[in-house]
Every structure is written in C-alpha cells, then in structure tokens.
Amino acid sequence: MNLAEGVQIVSFAILAAMMIGSAIGVVLLENVVYSAFLLGGVFISIAGLYLLLNADFVAAAQVLIYVGAVNVLILFAIMLVNKREAFQPIAKSWIRRAATALVCAGIFALLSAMVLTTPWAISTAVPIESSIITIGLHFFTDFLLPFELASILLLMALVGAIVLARREFLPDEDEADTALTLPERPRELVPAGQNNPEN
C-alpha cells in the first residue's frame, strides 16, 4: 500500500494494539465463544499487517483460511459440543499463572532485544503491481468451473454443519402399546372348596 510514513506508523500501532489486546482476551476470558471471536480479531489484525507490507495476496489468504475456515471450524466445534459445565478450580493455580507469565515475559524480552539490536535496512525498491487482481481474473476466466465447484462444496458443508448444530434432542419414545392398554387387574385368591361369588 502506497501510504505516507505517518499513516503507516499509526496504522501499524493500531493493528499491533488490536492484535495484542485480542490475544490477551483469548487467553484470559473464560467464555470460549468470546475467545474464538477474539481469535478472529487476531487473524484480521495480522492480515492488516500484511497489507502494510504490500502482501495483499497473503492478507487475503490469511482472511480466507484462518478467519473463514479455521475460526469458523472452531465456532462450529464449540456449538456441536455444547458443553455447559463450568471448569473445576485447580489447586495452586497461581503457580501455573506465574510460570506462564514468566515464560511470556522472557519471550517478549528476547524478541525486543532482537528487534533493537538488528541493523534493519530500509528498502528503496519500488512496489510492484498488485498480484491479487491478476489472480482474481484467472479465477473468473480460466479456472471458473473449479472455483464454482469448490464454492458449491463449501456451501454444502456449511449447510450440513448448520443442520447438525441446530438439531433437537428428542426424548426416548415409550412403547407404543402402553398408551392403548390397561394394566391387568390382579386376581384374588379363592380358597379351595369355596364358590366364586361372581358365578
């Protein structure tokens, strides 16, 4: 993208803050559905960073594959499992949290040191023409039939997943004869030699 340097810096800061905030929400939120949606926000932020690097095809692939396939697959898995039990508290969970925070801080320190000590060279190459337009033209001219077949296949998979997710659990059917028959009345025992009064 041919943007001014100030616009690129501001866009990078916004996308980086959005990505880091969404990633923290994925880890800290207890609701799995919210975590899945925030994971989609992380993927979209990464796609925006690819756009700033003039990698438009990689950005489109990021959105199509990770947001459109992986994230949707995670959401369908959550809906199909439909587990409503709360997580059991873990004894001394603060030790695990402290260890995780220490590892994350160490990785962040290593990456920061690498970024600050590396002599980055500013590229003066002229950006080439966008390749995603050429790929789109090929999709709708030379490869139109495979493209449409793939879209129909994905549509069938989506409809099947929706049907499975919206299915209703019916109770077990009772025996069909129980509603039409009466239980048999127990017969009274009659001593031997005594006539039945009904006779």
UniProtKB/Swiss-Prot annotation:
One of its GO terms (cellular component) is transmembrane transporter complex. Its EC number is 7.1.1.-. It is an enzyme of class 7 (translocase). The chain crosses the membrane at residues 9-29, 32-52, 61-81, 102-122, 143-163. The keyword Calcium does not apply. It holds the Pfam family Oxidored_q3. The keyword Metal-binding does not apply. One of its GO terms (molecular function) is quinone binding. Disulfide bonds: none annotated. It is a multi-pass membrane protein. It is found in: Membrane. Its main location: membrane. It catalyses: a plastoquinone + NADH + (n+1) H(+)(in) = a plastoquinol + NAD(+) + n H(+)(out); a plastoquinone + NADPH + (n+1) H(+)(in) = a plastoquinol + NADP(+) + n H(+)(out). Keywords: Membrane, NAD, NADP, Plastoquinone, Quinone, Translocase, Transmembrane, Transmembrane helix. Belongs to the complex I subunit 6 family. NDH-1 shuttles electrons from NAD(P)H, via FMN and iron-sulfur (Fe-S) centers, to quinones in the respiratory chain. The immediate electron acceptor for the enzyme in this species is believed to be plastoquinone. Couples the redox reaction to proton translocation (for every two electrons transferred, four hydrogen ions are translocated across the cytoplasmic membrane), and thus conserves the redox energy in a proton gradient. This is NAD(P)H-quinone oxidoreductase chain 6.
